[in-house]
Amino acid sequence: MGQSKRPFKNKEEKKSRGFGRSRHDDAGAGGRPQVKKAVFESTKKKEIGVSDLTLLSKVSNEAINENLKKRFEHGEIYTYIGHVLVSVNPFRDLGIYTDKVLESYRGKNRLEVPPHVFAVAEAGYYNMKAYKENQCVIISGESGAGKTEAAKRLMQYIANVSGGTDSSIQQTKDMVLATNPLLESFGNAKTLRNNNSSRFGKYLELQFNSVGEPVGATITNYLLEKSRVVGQIKNERNFHIFYQFTKAAPQSYRDAFGIQQPQSYVYTSRSQCFDVAGMNDAADFNETIEAMRIIGLRQAEQDNIFRVLSAILWLGNMQFQEDDHSNASINDQSIIDFVAYLLEVDAEGVQKALTQRIVETARGGRRGSIYEVPLNTVQATAVRDALAKALYFNLFDWIVQRVNASLTAKGTVTNTIGILDIYGFEIFERNSFEQLCINYVNEKLQQIFIQLTLKTEQEEYAREQIKWTPIKYFDNKVVCQLIEDKRPPGVFAALNDACATAHADSGAADQTFVGRLNFLSQNPNFESRQGQFIVKHYAGDVAYAVEGMTDKNKDQLLKDLLNLVNSSTNSFLHTLFPNRVNQDDKRRPPTAGDKIKASANDLVTTLAKAQPSYIRTIKPNDNKSPSEYNVANVIHQIKYLGLQENVRIRRAGFAYRQTFEKFVERFYLLSPKTSYAGEYTWTGDAESGARQILKDTSIPPEEYQMGVAKAFIKTPETLFALEHMRDRYWHNMATRIQRAWRNYLRYRTECAIRIQRFWRRVTGGLEFIKLRDQGHKILGGRKERRRYSLVGSRRFLGDYLGISNAGDMGDVIKSSINISSGENILYSCRCELLVTKFGRSSKPSPRLLILTSRNVYVVVQKFVNNQLSILAERMIPIGAIKFVSTSNLKDDWFSIGVGAQQEPDPLISCVFKTEFFTYLTNALRGQLNLRIGETIEYNKKPGKLAVVKAVKDPAVPRDDVYKSGTIRTGPGEPANSVSKPTPRPKQVPGKPITKGKLLRPGGPGGGPSKLAPRPKPVAQNLPENPRAAKQPAGEKFKPVAQSVTAVAAAHARTNSGSQNRPPPPPPPTQPPAPKKDTAKALYDFDSGRSNELPLRKGEIVQVVTKESNGWWLCMNLETSAQGWAPEAYLEPIVAKTPSLPPPPPSLPPQSKSAVSNTLPNGPSRVNGAAAKAKPAPPAPPFKRPDINRKAAPAAAPRDSAVSMNSHESPAGSGRATPSSLSNASIAGGLAEALRARQSAMQGKEQDDDDW
């Protein structure tokens, strides 16, 4: 029925209509429906009237007219009647056919967008692709109502959305669009009602392949008004091509064909109308030439076309006058010669064909005598006009055939979309044979509309036993029978009989025709009057003049003219007139009425094979005014178009009907009982399958009815919902497949990662283990080892500071100390450098030690003007290193012997010294001179060698302590010790390969997942003595740390028995909430910055975050405003320590064995853990953080146990150094230091001064 079956575009629209909801759609958080937030649509255009006439509160012709008028006045020219589009000609450009508007209709059903011809095109194209059914669009309405424009817009839309990037497909699209300007030039003309009136009918059939790409097209033309070639009424014009050609012909054509302006030719000047408002003939001529090029007409073919047009124009200038015998003669011989030149025939033959007629007499079936009968001026003029009309008519037919040849399908044709653009219904002051044929074809189209939308629909409801209230309508079948029937004879039959009876005399034939019409006087739709007859058409009563009808019906060219054309040497003329004159053929040739009737029936048959869509065009006024709306004329069109009846049937009818078999075939995916994984599984009959589908999709019973063989859907919204659910099924299946595939890919990735992780664990760490073992060999059993150096999990990782990591602190350090990109970072670690200070003892100071493939860097970090500065304190090329010296004890000190003339050798303490030796050895390709002895040698000053003694002292609490040139360290592991085996990792339960729900346990190919039922609780018999309870197999007892009091109390309760059990103690009280830090403002503070908190003296604020850079993040207790405040302006408020609770009561004496059995080593572990205190985190850089950024967490301590603190103080070094001068004044401290130096240097040389 041409109904658009395009689904809803989004879920919200579908759900708003109540279709296809899942049980999860109505429940959100807490089980409440999720209601979409309302948004004011300020840009939405307010609807004028109703966009669908079925929504009118009152159905009448006046109500329909009022709605159309209201919409017309506001520029809304399109309105629906269900799926029928009503279009009112605006006579102006509304800007509604742009590419942007076109794209807005792509992929939308008609309910989602305003009424438009693009929506009809989209529905037809979608239905063709989705249902594999041929489609057609029937455009009807009177002349000037906008049928041709609607057809052009349909072609525009289909060409844009039909896809296809292949060059041949694009060429087909271009050629189809090019047919519009070409055929309009040759088939359209200006009339009183329409400046671009189609004077022929056209059925364009677009051909598509299986994927919806256009592969070809065919055009069938009907009823070309060839009489317009030789005459027009005032203020009308000939066909457009004559004015385009005469105004814009190139000079070559003017010279070859003698072309002049249109005022010079009788056929183009008779009506004295040469120009049309809003039309540029010269520009249109160029567009016509371009269309010919696109379609593929060669230059020779174009030349022949314009040669024939020139001959027609010059034929019209051939005037006749009477000679002495009252016979016709041509007064201008030059015109005869030029016409003969254009037709490429003999000039004498032209003169004879136009002024004489050859008559042949027959006797007894034999050929008789042949006479040359001269013609009078009237007869000669008629022969001239007949030749001109025949030339143009055959030329037009040839152009259509040539276009079809270019548009021949270049692939397999699967489906078609037809567009019918034909004459509208015509009623003039004088109506002749042309109007009878045109109105007859419109009656046939109206009959199709009635049969498919009114009669057939109601008959189908009755046949299918659907509840239905019949609606009365006018069936125009009787009018069609009046014109076309043979028994009893209709108008065409009577006309043919008159032509056959009195074929020689036109006047006698017309009178015979009038006599035959008297037999039709009993028909209620026919009236006969003097010299005319009236037919009561569906669009109104039309009076037709009898005069000249028989001649027009004969539609025969005189044999004299055919002989003239056949004598031409121009092969193109022979192509235009392919039928040779058969002198012996006695059969009556088909008349014009016969041809029209056959064409109309063929058209009806073609349309019946397709699913039709309808566009009903309405002309608002006869003056082509963009503002005038003639109510009387519009109501007349509403009546004869049957819009009121169409509205009533659409309101009471069903939007969609389909056989049970096709319905189930289309929608079986929507029910789990009729399909599984896309496969059809229904085993019952088709009717029950259709009912099951409608039931499972929650379609209300009032929205459908089940007939005898078909399912009927009432509203298009229901159909759109079904289509949307069907489309979403495939989307959901695709999503499930994608989810399964992504899950499988994730599974494979996780498996690969596990394998890679295991392989790296096995092989990736071997390199670092080899380096560690190489370190043992480098030491060569000459140095005692620390226990940490020998643990099995120790690896020589090298770059502990991450200097080589991009985008991290490493980039900052590399750029600060100018490490080139060609240097590979081999080793980096924190260390301490022995630094000599004037007037003070040498002390270790924190540094960074970096080894590259070229240099050794000693990097210092310090604050300069409250900014962290990173400097390369020392850069030593590895080639300049003469030796590395270290002691034979377990201390971490070593020196790098360079022997520079300006700088001393560095003496460094680094916990990863052996690793440094290893990487340095590799960098030097094994040429490192490693000196290991009881002392460490180094140049304390340039050119002055000094030694540092290493002394073993078991009393040293830490690894080693440096003081006054001596390193004291505890005993270490034997020098020949090697690393212990790598410990096996802790056995933990294996994690699942993936968290996906679509994979079986163990990955693809595993056994099916079966959920074990949850066991029900069963009463168990517990032993009286809890100690006797047996531990489960494989589960070890884990002691829990408890206080001695609790253990003793538990032991006492266990031995006391169940009869004298004391009451349970009260539940412990909730621990107090942690108190928030507060501070009191000592001074007023108001900087005016947005990220700083103003303070008033004495004000109490809450401290949120304390930064070590001198700024605290505080919050005002009254306004809750947060901001940064200087630490110096605040005094923390220390909360009073609450008094300790009284000690617990003493316990009864317990045996040691009981306590030890209950909790082995429990108290000692607790106390030991509490005794160890974590080291303080390093201070962050001095930078005030932004208020919107979280404070940086404190950095975790490194494994090296070397502080990051860059302040050169004893506390920063972490070493045991003298601190007796820390609390003295500067002068006093200096004097005391000098006295200490003097006593320490007694008996020593000046070079041994460490102070």
Curated annotation (Swiss-Prot):
Residues 48-727 form the Myosin motor domain. GO terms for molecular function: actin filament binding; ATP binding; hydrolase activity; microfilament motor activity. Phosphorylation of the TEDS site (Ser-369) is required for the polarization of the actin cytoskeleton. Phosphorylation probably activates the myosin-I ATPase activity. It is found in: Cytoplasm, Cytoskeleton, Actin patch. The modification Phosphoserine is found at residue 369. Residues 1061-1073, 1139-1148 have a biased composition (Pro residues). InterPro entries: Fungal_myosin-I_SH3, Kinesin_motor_dom_sf, Myo1_CA, Myosin_head_motor_dom-like, Myosin_TH1, MYSc_Myo1, P-loop_NTPase, SH3-like_dom_sf. Residues 1074-1135 form the SH3 domain. Gene3D superfamilies: 1.10.10.820, 1.20.5.4820, 1.20.58.530, Kinesin motor domain, Myosin VI head, motor domain, U50 subdomain, SH3 Domains. Its main location: cytoplasm. Residues 1040-1052 have a biased composition (Low complexity). Residues 1150-1161, 1216-1225 have a biased composition (Polar residues). Residues 9-27 have a biased composition (Basic and acidic residues). CDD domains: MYSc_Myo1 (cd01378), SH3_Myosin-I_fungi (cd11858). ATP binds at residues 141-148. Keywords: Actin-binding, ATP-binding, Cytoplasm, Cytoskeleton, Hydrolase, Motor protein, Myosin, Nucleotide-binding, Phosphoprotein, Repeat, SH3 domain. It holds the Pfam family SH3_1. Type-I myosin implicated in the organization of the actin cytoskeleton. Required for proper actin cytoskeleton polarization. At the cell cortex, assembles in patch-like structures together with proteins from the actin-polymerizing machinery and promotes actin assembly. Functions as actin nucleation-promoting factor (NPF) for the Arp2/3 complex. The myosin motor domain displays actin-stimulated ATPase activity and generates a mechanochemical force. Belongs to the TRAFAC class myosin-kinesin ATPase superfamily. Myosin family. This is Myosin-1. The gene is MYO1.
